[in-house]
Amino acid sequence: MTTNYIFVTGGVVSSLGKGIAAASLAAILEARGLKVTMMKLDPYINVDPGTMSPTQHGEVFVTEDGAETDLDLGHYERFIRTKMTKRNNFTAGRVYADVLRKERRGDYLGATIQVIPHITNAIKDRVIAGSEGHDVAIVEVGGTVGDIESLPFMEAIRQLAVELGRERAMFMHLTLVPYLAAAGEVKTKPTQHSVKELLSIGIQPDILVCRSDRMIPANERKKIALFCNVQEKAVISMKDVDSIYKIPQLVKSQGLDDLVCARFGINAPEADLSEWEQVIYEEANPTGEVTIGMVGKYIELPDAYKSVNEALKHAGLKNRLNVTIKYVDSQDVETKGVEVLEGLDAILVPGGFGDRGIEGKIRAAQYARENKVPYLGICLGMQVALIEYARNVAGMEGAHSTEFNKDTKYPVVGLITEWVDGEGKVEERTETSDLGGTMRLGSQLCHLEKGTKARELYGNATIHERHRHRYEVNNNLRPQIEKAGLKVSGLSADKKLVEMIENPAHPWFVAAQFHPEFTSTPRDGHPLFAGFVKAAGQNARGEFEK
C-alpha cells in the first residue's frame, strides 16, 4: 500500500490547536473510507513525557502497547478509529538516544555523527516505519516554526517531501489571524511572517489553516493566498467554536478534504459525518445537568486531566446530561474541610503521584462513602478509597500505601515487584528502579466478578483496559478488608492483582486501578464513565437514599 503524507506545522504562537486540526482532517478522511494514521513528533530532549510534570506538559497518554506519549495522541484516538502505538509518537531525546546507541555499537563505521544526515535520517526512518499500511499519514510536528529545537524535524520532513514527490506529500500550516478591535479588522501580517519563516527553511505550505475568533473574510483570504503563495481555496478558516467536535464539519464545509484527495489523486466517496452530527446534536440538547467534583493536585492545568475531562463529557452525551466539572484542590480538602465537597452530584478522584494532598483525597473518598455520593476512583483514586475503607471500616488504624509511608503498620497498598505484561512477559521492579518507563503500562486483561456493578456496567466477563502505575493492593491484607464489606470486582489476567473494587453498601461506589479515560470516545463513550454520570444524574434528582 502506498502511503501519502500530510505534514502539519504551526506558527506565530503555540497552543493553536494543531492536534485538533490534524485530527479533524483525519476524521473526515476516515469518513471517506480511507485508512488513516497520525503521528506526533516532539522536539524536546526527554526520551518520553513519562516523567514530565503534568502541570507543565499536561497528561501523559498511554497507548495500548504501553507507550507513554503526548496528550495529542488522546485527541487522535478520540477522533479516529485507528489505535495509536509507540510508533505514533517520538521525541528528539528518543532519536538522539537511538543514534548515540548505534554510534557506540559502531554501526556508523567511524563516521562523524551530525544532525544532517544522521539525526534527520533517523527521524525519516521512524516516520516511514510508523505509517506503513495506511492510505494517509498525518504527521504533526510539535512546537512553533522558528524554534531551535524543531529545526532537525523541519529539515527531515522537508527532505521526506522531496524524496516522496509532490504527488505523495503536502504541508499544512496553522497560523494565527488575530482580530484587532481598535482597527475593526483581522490582521494577516503574523501569518505572512510565519510562512516567510517556513519558506526560509525550504518548506512551501500547500494549505493554510487560520485560527481566529471569527471566520476570515473573503478579502483577507485573498490577501493571505497572494502573499503566502497558496491557492485561495487552500486558505481554511478555523474559527473558535464551543466544541472541538464541531471542527470536522467546519473544515469539511470549506473543502479541506477535497484539497487533500485532489492532491493525492484519491478517488473516495463523500465523507459520511452522520456520527459527528449525532455527537453535536447530543451536545447541544441535554435534558439535565450535573456537577462533578474532580479532587486532584494538578488542577491549575486542566490539561493534566485531559482524557478524564473528555471522558466525562462523552458520558454526559450518552446520558443527555450537561456535565460541569468543579476542580477541587485536594489540599483544600485538608485545610478547609469537606465543606468544599458539598453540593456535588458526584466525586471523582483521578490518578496522581506523590504525597502532596493525599490526605485530602482520602477524606474525599470518605465523604463520598459516608454521604452516599457517587464515587469513581481512577488509579490512585482506587488506592485512596481502599486506604480510607481500611482505616475507617476495617479497623486498620493508620493504614496507608508504602508510596507515602514505608513504616505503616498496615501497608494496604505496596510496590508491584512482579507482573505479567500484555505480551506475556514477566516484568520485575524494585524500590531502586528508574522512574522513567518502569511502571505497569499498557492494555491488560481484567476478569470481572459475577454479580458486581463492574460486570453489569461492562456487560462482559473480561475486559481490556490501560494501566500506568507501580503500586497495587497488598494481597496479604485483602482478606481483612473484604471481610469488612469491600468487594474486589476485578482481577488481573493471572488473578493476582486487584484491578477494581466497589462498595455494595453504597448506591454507586466503584474504583479501578486502570485508566478507563484512555479508551473513551465521543462517538462511543465508555461504560464506566457512562454509569458514573448516570448515577450523578440520579443523585441530582434525589433518587438515592442517603
From Swiss-Prot:
Binding site for Mg(2+): 72, 140
Binding site for UTP: 14, 187-192, 223
Residues the record marks as active site: 379, 515, 517
Keywords in alphabetical order: ATP-binding, Glutamine amidotransferase, Ligase, Magnesium, Metal-binding, Nucleotide-binding, Pyrimidine biosynthesis
Binding site for ATP: 15-20, 72, 239-241
Catalytic activity, reaction form: UTP + L-glutamine + ATP + H2O = CTP + L-glutamate + ADP + phosphate + 2 H(+); L-glutamine + H2O = L-glutamate + NH4(+); UTP + NH4(+) + ATP = CTP + ADP + phosphate + 2 H(+)
Domain Glutamine amidotransferase type-1, first and last residues per copy: 291-542
Ranges for region Amidoligase domain: 1-266
Keyword Ligase listed: yes
E.C. no: 6.3.4.2
One example of a Gene Ontology biological process annotation: 'de novo' CTP biosynthetic process
HAMAP family, sorted: PyrG
Record's subunit section: Homotetramer.
Further remarks about this protein from its record: CTPSs have evolved a hybrid strategy for distinguishing between UTP and CTP. The overlapping regions of the product feedback inhibitory and substrate sites recognize a common feature in both compounds, the triphosphate moiety. To differentiate isosteric substrate and product pyrimidine rings, an additional pocket far from the expected kinase/ligase catalytic site, specifically recognizes the cytosine and ribose portions of the product inhibitor.
Protein name: CTP synthase
Organism: Vibrio campbellii (strain ATCC BAA-1116)
Source species taxonomy: Bacteria, Pseudomonadati, Pseudomonadota, Gammaproteobacteria, Vibrionales
